[in-house]
């Protein structure tokens, strides 16, 4: 983040404007936004504020954020710390005219010591119930939902899809966290597009797997699945 001085930010912003590119930022899921320890609490707040400031300098249209993670015996206190911290970040984003997108993260085995937040439908709903702002919307990662017991359909039917700004796409084996190239796992992408597009979704899709070449190639596969469902494509 320190490398983004005024000169670099100006060049990136000008390049996006010149080529008609839409730029978004994505914070690291490894940074624990549910931090409760002295010094680290303040650092987590500063981390989010700095991303918001950077988005303004770059002209980025959104910032994907995460709820952090908890350990075995501290779920309640860390979840509330996470919600409170994101609430503070949203208040700052409102002042800076920045848009935050909260991502649903992947579930871990039930007996795992560490668990991400939010990692299921109920937790995702809770975050949006406690933080209501036009500057906080949902980034729906479908491969995380795919190996949840309720699946992609359960999330689409259970969430208020008017909150959804971004759909993050990768294939998955239905068993554990892995971002696979579309067509190599068992996600039914035709059905995924049908569910999401029929929900009134008006946001953007974002590939999240492999290399840049993998994602460009995967884009063509995904477009074919969408066309098979009769979904109009704007090139």
What is each model feature region?
Residues 1-57, 129, 133-135, 153, ...:
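N-terminal pre-domain/capping segments
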Residues 7-20, 85-92, 154-155, 191-195:
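Catalytic-core regions built around general acid/base machinery
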Residues 17-18, 34-137, 147:
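Active-site acidic/histidine proton-transfer and metal-coordination neighborhood
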Residues 21, 98, 201:
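Short phosphate-binding/catalytic loops that engage adenosine nucleotides
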Residues 27-31, 67-71, 104-108, 142-146, ...:
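Active-site-proximal loop/turn and secondary-structure-junction residues that shape catalytic pockets
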Residues 61, 112, 121-235:
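Histidine-acidic metal/acid-base catalytic patches
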């Amino acid at each position: 983040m320190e490398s983004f001085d005024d000169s670099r930010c100006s060049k990136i912003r000008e390049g996006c404007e010149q080529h008609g590119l839409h730029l978004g930022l994505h914070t690291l899921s490894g940074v624990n936004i549910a931090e409760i320890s002295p010094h680290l609490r303040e650092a987590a707040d500063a981390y989010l504020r700095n991303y918001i400031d950077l988005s303004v300098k770059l002209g980025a249209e959104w910032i994907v954020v995460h709820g952090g993670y908890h350990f075995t015996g501290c779920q309640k206190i860390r979840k509330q710390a996470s919600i409170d911290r994101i609430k503070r970040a949203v208040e700052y984003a409102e002042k800076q005219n920045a848009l935050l997108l909260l991502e649903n993260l992947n579930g871990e085995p039930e007996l795992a010591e560490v668990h991400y937040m939010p990692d299921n439908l109920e937790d995702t709903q809770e975050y949006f119930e406690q933080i209501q702002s036009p500057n906080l919307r949902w980034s729906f990662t479908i491969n995380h939902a795919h190996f949840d017991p309720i699946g992609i359909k359960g999330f689409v039917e259970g969430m208020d899809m008017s909150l959804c700004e971004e759909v993050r796409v990768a294939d998955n084996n239905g068993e554990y966290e892995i971002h696979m190239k579309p067509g190599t796992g068992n996600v039914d992408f035709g059905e995924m597009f049908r569910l999401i597009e029929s929900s009134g979704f008006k946001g953007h899709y974002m590939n999240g797997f492999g290399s840049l070449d993998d994602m460009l190639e995967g884009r063509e596969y995904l477009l074919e699945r969408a066309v098979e469902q009769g979904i109009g494509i704007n090139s």
